[in-house]
């Protein structure tokens, strides 16, 4: 759809001040730079919308919004269907997912080595290199202002689904203990249950963020996805792992509150 140019005017690396959202579609990845289109897609990520609702949210003339919708549809980012209450109207929806965003204000200007660290052969830790590789990729993207949180969350959810049988337990306390044991055995961090009503987990030495720059924002999208999938399976209904503290926010641990659909924060109890 839209492509950045480098300082010499050739297609390539985005301009330093360019904000871009990257969407996956059935036809491949699509980059969206135009702020009006980004606003439209942000609204559609929340829910499906009618044309009139999109016009109101975008704050642009109907003719302008219509052109943007046509281009987004042609790129395969959105689709539409007739409104069941009025066949003359259309309801618009996303056909893909937000994969990443390039946001100049989130660029990390510090030296990569300060956060990526060094690999020391013979350290005796078989997981050290893989943690280093994950951290280096993450910080390299942060230096460019690229946020992969949506993609990392979905990857975490997939992994959580695969992991669930290995940690499943009918009682919530035992379930949390199994998760903590798995985290420690695989050098992912140390998990403690800080509160039971609601259920709050603390993660120390978190593999995902312990060495990341302090940005003031949560950084554990991958962990959030894993925990979301695990507790959704455990409680038998959609759950969220809401990160309220993180190493990247200046804390010495990460803190997750487990929120379950229809019940707010979930208590640590045996599910009925």
List where the protein language model places each region.
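Short capping segments at the starts of secondary-structure elements
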Residues: 35, 46-50
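Short helix-coil-helix linker/hinge
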Residues: 30-37
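Low-complexity, intrinsically disordered Gly/Pro/Thr-rich segments
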Residues: 78, 237-246
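Active-site helix/loop of acyl-thioester processing domains in fatty-acid/polyketide metabolism
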Residues: 218-236
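Short alpha-helical segment immediately N-terminal to, or the first helix within
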Residues: 42-44
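Residues within the helices of the helix-turn-helix
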Residues: 51-52, 70
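N-terminal accessory segment detector
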Residues: 2-24, 30, 56, 62, ...
């Amino acid at each position: 759809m839209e492509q950045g140019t480098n300082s010499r005017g050739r297609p390539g690396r985005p301009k330093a001040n360019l904000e871009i959202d990257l969407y996956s579609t059935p036809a491949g990845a699509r980059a969206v730079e135009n702020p009006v289109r980004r606003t439209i897609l942000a609204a559609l990520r929340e829910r499906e919308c009618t044309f009139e609702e999109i016009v109101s949210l975008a704050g642009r003339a109907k003719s302008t919004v219509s052109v943007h919708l046509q281009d987004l549809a042609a790129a395969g980012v959105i689709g539409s269907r007739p409104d069941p209450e009025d066949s003359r109207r259309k309801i618009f929806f996303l056909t893909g997912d937000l994969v990443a965003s390039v946001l100049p204000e989130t660029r990390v200007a510090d030296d990569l080595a300060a956060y990526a660290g060094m690999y020391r052969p013979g350290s005796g830790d078989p997981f050290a290199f893989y943690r280093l590789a994950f951290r280096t990729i993450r910080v390299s993207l942060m230096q460019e202002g690229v946020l992969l949180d949506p993609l990392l969350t979905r990857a975490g959810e997939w992994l959580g689904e695969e992991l669930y049988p290995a940690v499943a337990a009918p009682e919530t306390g035992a379930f949390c203990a199994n998760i903590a044991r798995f985290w420690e055995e695989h050098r992912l961090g140390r998990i403690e249950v800080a509160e039971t009503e609601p259920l709050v987990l603390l993660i120390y030495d978190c593999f995902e963020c312990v060495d990341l720059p302090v940005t003031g924002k949560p950084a554990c999208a991958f962990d959030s996805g894993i925990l979301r999938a695990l507790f959704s399976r455990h409680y038998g209904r959609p759950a969220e792992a809401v990160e309220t503290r993180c190493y990247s926010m200046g804390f010495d641990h990460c803190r997750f509150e487990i929120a379950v659909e229809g019940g707010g924060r979930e208590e640590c109890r045996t599910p009925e």
